[in-house]
Amino acid sequence: MKNLLICIIKMYRKYISSLKRPSCRFYPTCSQYSIEAIEKYGALKGTLISIKRILKCHPFNEGGYDPVK
């Protein structure tokens, strides 16, 4: 399951995200953060952590450096 989620994120980065201008307010980007979270915490907890991060990525949040903890 973990590898499937990471593959989906990589496909998103290659085929969808590459067509848009960069818009993530954080470093690492939300997709890279998601991969790192899934690798570190597993499919379920990593996905939940990723969703929390993605919900913070909007114009009213300053963004900045936010590594997987």
Swiss-Prot record:
Membrane topology, record value: Peripheral membrane protein
Keyword Cell wall biogenesis/degradation in record: no
Subcellular location: Cell membrane
GO cellular component: plasma membrane
Entry keyword set: Cell membrane, Membrane
Main location: membrane
Family indicated by similarity: Belongs to the UPF0161 family.
Function: Could be involved in insertion of integral membrane proteins into the membrane.
NCBIfam families reported for this sequence: membrane protein insertion efficiency factor YidD
Database matches in PANTHER family: MEMBRANE PROTEIN INSERTION EFFICIENCY FACTOR-RELATED
UniProt-recorded name of the protein: Putative membrane protein insertion efficiency factor
Species annotation: Clostridium botulinum (strain 657 / Type Ba4)
